[in-house]
Amino acid sequence: MQIAVLLSGGVDSSVALYIMIQKGYKNIKCYYLKIWLEDELSYIGECPWKEDINYVEAVCKKFNVPYEIISLQDEYYKRVVTYAIEELKIGNTPSPDIFCNQRIKFGAFFDKINEHYDLIVTGHYAKIENKNDHYILKQAKDKIKDQSYFLSHLSRKQISKLHFPLGDLLKTEIRQIAQKIDLPNKNRKDSQGICFLGKIKYDEFIKYHLGELKGNIIEQETGKILGTHNGYWFFTIGQRKGIKLSHGPWFVTEKDIQNNIIYISNSINYLKQGKQQFLVHKTNWINKPLNNGDLSAKIRHGEKKIKCKIEMLKNDIIKVDLEEKDYGISPGQFCIFYQEDECLGGAKILKTLT
């Protein structure tokens, strides 16, 4: 069996490689996907991916496996970064990591490698089950680290080639393994945020591409101008961080894109702003829901799932009715559907209702 392992330089993918070797697999080649955007990195004066490469090289040397660096920067910019920028321009909240998995790690990478591989192994926190050639994507044992949300837009064909060795392990167990086998990167911190940013702050990335534009911050209930902001594209519905005003905490409740206005509400009135119903479109079903199964949804990456009902409307639009209110539903985000711990797929949020 020919196996490709995607290494990031982090602990998770390195432990995934170790597990495959421990299981007796021999024909393994590792790949590092270079998707760093050089223009965005120029002002921080260093190349963060070089540290990744050093760790990848050290891990592969330890286990005596070959590795190759594959540059996917052009593909990443065209298929993911451009999408994120266009969504921000129209006031939506993009989810770049979903498309990074669908279009790059398991899209462009699949297209790029000439060798034939029976299995692609990564350090994602998720599970894949195969029941008579029927592939199921499931949540990981570690529900806090679970990444099924970001894998929800893969096709069944993509899933059929994947294996996630960490799906039945907790993060603490993975750290213990790394220490026990003395991995070169055993003490390396986990990466945070969007896959391509690394040391770049998200707001800095947005500023680089969209600049700044002064606008008013208005209290939702009174219409009173409370302050100014640097552009609606820096904010998302439900956001609290970054609103530096007294008498808070304040939360974003609405964005007026035409007039570059951010509406906010304080903690008391904010609780009245929650939504339970919204429309989604552009659905990707890995497996369609069973009629007799309870359905739940994730509006964002994290542990929380909310029970819901769905109604199929015209033009492939789906109405979602949550069992409880959510306070951060924003167009452009993705709603991912689950039955128990199976990830069925997901859809892009079109607009909120009530």
Curated annotation (Swiss-Prot):
GO molecular function per UniProt: ATP binding; tRNA binding; tRNA-uridine 2-sulfurtransferase activity
UniProt keyword Disulfide bond present: yes
Reactions accelerated catalytically: S-sulfanyl-L-cysteinyl-[protein] + uridine(34) in tRNA + AH2 + ATP = 2-thiouridine(34) in tRNA + L-cysteinyl-[protein] + A + AMP + diphosphate + H(+)
Pfam families per UniProt: tRNA_Me_trans (PF03054), tRNA_Me_trans_C (PF20258), tRNA_Me_trans_M (PF20259)
Alphabetized UniProt keyword annotations: ATP-binding, Cytoplasm, Disulfide bond, Nucleotide-binding, RNA-binding, Transferase, tRNA processing, tRNA-binding
Record site: Interaction with tRNA: H124, Q333
Catalytic residues of the enzyme: C100 (nucleophile), C195 (cysteine persulfide intermediate)
EC top class named in words: transferase
Top-rank taxon, per record: Bacteria
CDD domains on file: MnmA_TRMU-like (cd01998)
UniProt-annotated binding residues for ATP: L6, L7, S8, G9, G10, V11, D12, S13, L33, G123
Keyword match Transferase: yes
Predominant cellular place of this UniProt entry's protein: cytoplasm
Location of the region described as Interaction with tRNA in the Swiss-Prot/TrEMBL record: 145-147
Subcellular location: Cytoplasm
GO cellular component terms, semicolon-separated: cytoplasm
Disulfide bonds: C100-C195
GO biological process: tRNA modification
EC number(s) per entry: 2.8.1.13
Function in brief: Catalyzes the 2-thiolation of uridine at the wobble position (U34) of tRNA, leading to the formation of s(2)U34.
Family in the record: Belongs to the MnmA/TRMU family.
Protein name: tRNA-specific 2-thiouridylase MnmA
Organism: Borrelia turicatae (strain 91E135)
